[in-house]
Amino acid sequence: MPSVNIDLQAHPNLQFRIDCFTVPAASRPDFEAAMHRNLAFIETLQGFEGHVVFEKTAGPSAFDVVTIGVWESPEAVAAAGEKVRAHYQSIGFDMPAMLARWGVTAALGFYNAPPAMQ
């Protein structure tokens, strides 16, 4: 079970990768397998603090899976992005094409937690 401790006062530069997905039931096993493979690689990267996956249980949102990855700083995110792109290229993985093939829709982005908004 993942553990993520978010102490914004002690770590004000934390960066959050929040990805929201709508996953057709028929594609769910392939999607989950790819998600686990991706996480196994990301966990090896410097500055990665943790990851949590949420599954919708109620409400009007179109998204049924939400993932949140926590990074120690904007610099860690930038370095990780380069390594992830290189890794995907080395294994011939095309994320947008794979999501399209599975019929998955996604909203992806990086976020911070501005102190003035807390």
Regions found by a protein language model. Give the residues of each.
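An amphipathic, aromatic/His-enriched active-site/gating alpha helix that lines ligand/cofactor pockets
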Residues: 2-3, 9-10, 37-49, 70-108, ...
